[in-house]
Structure formats: structure tokens, C-alpha cells
Amino acid sequence: MQTRKVYLYVFHTMSDWEYGYLIAELNSGRYFKQDAASLKVVTVGVNKEMITTLGGLSIKPDISLDECTLGSQDLIILPGGNTWGEDIHQPILKKVGDALKLGTTIAAICGATLGLANEGYLNSRKHTSNDLDYMNMVCPNYKGETFYEKGPAVSDENLVTASGIAPLEFAVEVLKKLDVFAPDTLRSWYKLNKTQKPEYFFELMNTINR
């Protein structure tokens, strides 16, 4: 089997909080089940020029889109941001369209779901976003209203979508899709981060120290 790769698409105005839970766990592997291979998060940009996130962080992409080849075992994370309606994202959206057919896992949150919607990629797949009415208003090519589900995050085959205020649920759906956490580990990890109750930390530790 081809080695699984994880890509984080980076661009000006990307929303820092939306991918934090997810990439921290994927890159560290600290709660992975014993037979799960380690992963490295690779940042990919339209080009290799430095970008600035919404929070003011400067990120120099590891690779450009031209250097990024998405395989069926790979994951690409598409964060939200203020620019998804702009032409600069057309190259990644084209690549994502091909990758969806190939079986690559596509994880899109917040504004990135609008980019997918306007390309017609959500017209026949279960999905969610920040708001259906807003999606209908800003995405003229979107015809997937019957597949829209109200909820923080939705998974359908190789596609995960989420609201921008649900980064934790977004992470859970992607981690579940990749099958890198044992089910009880994922459940305890979610409860700890969702409730902030210390008993779930000890429950989490017990799931990985057996």
C-alpha cells in the first residue's frame, strides 16, 4: 500500500483555529493506536511564497501545488479563510475534484466548503457548512441542498465537511475516517476536549496504556 500522506493547504487569511486539533494529533501521533503508521503534515501552497494566517502567523509552504500529487491513500485538509471566492483557489479546487474521484480523503471546513460547493462537488454528496442559506446565496453553481445536513461535521465516503465553529468535531470525523485512533481513545479524546473534565484525561491515558 502506498504510504499515506497528509497535506495542509495554506493561504493568506486561513483560519488558524479550524485545523489545530487535527494537525496536532496527526503530526504527533501521540494517541495513535499501536499498529498505525506515523504521519507528517506537509504544507502546500499555490506557490512557495510565504503566507500569513488570520492570526498573523507566517508560513512558508513545504511544497507548491505543482509538486503535490494526491494519491488514493492521502488526505488533504482545506481550512476556511476569507478568500475562497477568489480565482487564486481554482488550481487547488481542480486538483481536489480529481482527487475526490480517485478516493483521496478531502477534509474541508468553513469557507473551503463554499469553494467545493461552487464547483458542484457537493451536489450529490452529504455535507454541511456554516449555513445553507448563505451557501445558496454565494455559490451559484451549488445544487446540493437536498444533501445538506445541519450539524457540526458530516462525513460521506471520502469527504468530510464542517462548520467553522466546529474544529473539534471536524477533527473527530477525519481521525475516524483515517482509523488512526482506537474507538475508545477517540471517544475519550473528544470528551476531554469538549467538556474540559479531568476524568476524561485519565480515561484517555488508560486507553493508550493497555
Swiss-Prot record:
EC number: 3.2.-.-
Chain ranges of the PfpI endopeptidase domain: 4-180
Gene Ontology CC, one term: cytoplasm
Enzyme kind, highest EC tier: hydrolase
Keyword Protease annotated: yes
Coiled coil segments of this chain: none
Keywords recorded for this protein, A-Z: Hydrolase, Protease
InterPro entries: Class_I_gatase-like, DJ-1/PfpI, Prot/Nucl_acid_deglycase
Gene Ontology biological process: proteolysis
Pfam families: DJ-1_PfpI
Keyword Transferase tagged: no
List of catalytic residues: C110 (nucleophile)
GO molecular function annotation: peptidase activity
Family: Belongs to the peptidase C56 family.
Protein name according to UniProt: Uncharacterized protease YoaZ
Source species of the chain: Bacillus subtilis (strain 168)
Lineage: Bacteria, Bacillati, Bacillota, Bacilli, Bacillales
Gene: yoaZ
